[in-house]
Regions:
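Amphipathic, interaction-prone secondary-structure segments
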Residues: 55-98
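Enriched - but not universal
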Residues: 21, 45, 87-88, 95, ...
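A recognition module on extended beta-rich or small alphabeta surfaces enriched in W/G with H and D/E
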Residues: 93-127
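Generic preference for hydrophobic/aromatic residues in regular secondary structure cores
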Residues: 22, 34, 88, 93, ...
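Small-side-chain structural scaffolding
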Residues: 10-11, 15-20, 69, 73, ...
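N-terminal low-complexity, intrinsically disordered segments
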Residues: 1-62
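Generic structural signal for hydrophobic core residues of well-folded globular domains
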Residues: 48-51, 79-80, 111, 124
Length: 127
């Protein structure tokens, strides 16, 4: 266990795992390398758009969207020094300025054509 894992709140456990899973799945299945950078979120937004254009049923992509949202949340946590919060099965990122962000919900909005994980991260990282 690394020092980072030891000090992370328990609310981070599931989203961190979902993010790691999507990084692995994209590397192995789509040959897309995600490196937890803000820049990588452009590729994530584009991938979600491609999935949407294929008209895949939501139920078929729900887990992938959750993974992409968790990945974006991890980018925000790493960029801003924020932390994951959880309640009632929902997960948010709280940035040091006290604002809350819902990257998993934003990934779902991306799938409907109304969101952007890249822009969410940009806004969350502004102080």
């Amino acid at each position: 266990m690394t020092a980072q894992q030891e000090t992370r709140p328990s609310a981070a456990t599931k989203p961190a795992r979902w993010a790691a899973d999507i990084v692995t799945a994209m590397r192995e299945g789509a040959r897309l390398r995600l490196d937890y950078s803000v820049r990588s979120l452009w590729s994530v937004d584009r991938t979600i758009e491609d999935i949407r254009r294929e008209a895949a049923p939501y139920a078929a992509v729900e887990t992938v969207l959750r993974g992409f949202g968790a990945y974006a949340g991890e980018v925000i946590v790493r960029q801003s020094g924020g932390e994951w919060w959880a309640s009632g099965g929902d997960h948010w990122v709280r940035t040091p300025d006290g604002r809350f962000w819902a990257p998993v919900d934003e990934a779902r909005r991306c799938y409907t054509g109304d969101g952007s994980l890249r822009l969410l991260c940009r806004d969350a990282s502004r102080r």
